[in-house]
Swiss-Prot record:
GO terms for molecular function: acetaldehyde dehydrogenase (acetylating) activity; NAD binding. The active site is at C133 (acyl-thioester intermediate). It comes from Spirochaeta aurantia. This is Acetaldehyde dehydrogenase. NAD(+) binds at T18, G19, N20, I21, S165, A166, G167, P168, A169, T170, R171, L172, N173, N275. One of its GO terms (biological process) is catabolic process. CDD domains: ALDH_C (cd23933).
């Protein structure tokens, strides 16, 4: 096994996957004082993402995972913005090379990570899985419910996103999206049963991402829940500025409901694509935690 390095500042990172998520991630990294993108890696040198990266002076490669076999010693961390199927191939190679990974696919290889909940507690992990967009939006709420309520019989999350924000990888990974989101919800809330639903809304003009959490609990305690939400929601907003509570928490017939909306900052993607923005923001928040840890060593 390799070194799993933590570099001196800034952290030397690479992006694997040059689609919408990878390109938006690149623009966000350009603003970070703790991260430097030293490679933008995909399969097509003529993709729009590669063209954008070259215009920013970022080194590009169309060698895909093979690039890291040849240049792994230069890189501290890789963001994998490909697909769940591809990450199953990439993960063992990157581990053997000793490169840390933040996985933006629903592959479930690494530890599931929600920055507002876990933050620095997972920094010894070599692979962090950023769950899904719906998972990032709902998990802070599900965790707060699990921490403050009694037994949770059932927890359901419904996320509605604009159809135009769901690219090929999102549509290809729908089954993995459901399974990964449900697993994260169960782990964080302790619910006996969980269900995740994703709605692709074709409405024009495009809607912002909207996520609702429903939880059937014994003896709901709204005061305890509101107190913890007043802590975890600002922690989420610290890295996702467009994360806002739209409704609740409220109780109806023993069922707690909370709704949030997520609006993106409009780097490479439209502002309505909050579903893509939130997972990128979460990934960068964790990469910056790695960088801070390196600075303290």
């Amino acid at each position: 096994m390799g070194r799993f390095p933590l570099a001196a500042k800034p952290l030397q990172v690479a992006i694997l996957g040059t689609g919408n998520i990878g390109t938006d991630l690149l623009l966000k990294i350009q603003r970070s004082q703790l991260l430097k993108c030293v490679a933008f890696v995909g399969r097509s040198s003529q993709s729009s993402g590669m063209v954008k990266a070259r215009s920013l002076g970022v080194p590009c490669s169309d060698l895909s995972i093979e690039y890291f076999r040849q240049n792994g010693e230069k890189i501290d961390l890789v963001f994998d913005a490909t697909s769940a199927k591809d990450h199953l191939v990439h993960a063992p190679i990157l581990r053997e090379l000793g490169i840390r990974v933040i996985d933006l696919t629903p592959a479930k290889v690494g530890k599931m990570c929600i920055p507002a909940v876990h933050r620095s507690s997972l920094l010894n992990e070599w692979n962090l899985n950023m769950v899904t967009c719906g998972g990032q939006a709902s998990s802070p709420l599900a965790w707060a419910i699990g921490q403050t309520q009694g037994s949770i019989e059932y927890l359901e999350v419904v996320s509605s996103i604009a159809s135009k924000s769901a690219g090929p990888a999102t549509r290809l990974n729908l089954d993995e999206y459901i399974h990964t989101t449900e697993k994260a919800l169960a782990e964080l809330s302790g619910a006996k049963n969980t269900k995740a639903i994703l709605v692709l809304n074709p409405a024009e003009p495009c809607i912002d991402m909207q996520t609702t959490v429903f939880a059937k609990v014994d003896s709901p305690d709204l005061l305890k829940l509101q107190k913890l939400l007043s802590e975890v929601i600002p922690r989420t907003q610290a890295y996702v500025p467009g994360y806002q509570v739209a409704l609740g928490p409220i109780v109806d017939n023993g069922r707690i409901s909370i709704m949030v909306r997520v609006r993106g900052v409009g780097d490479y993607l439209p502002e309505y694509a909050g579903n893509l923005d939130i997972i990128n923001c979460a990934a960068i928040a964790m990469a910056e935690e790695y960088a801070k840890a390196a600075h303290e060593q």
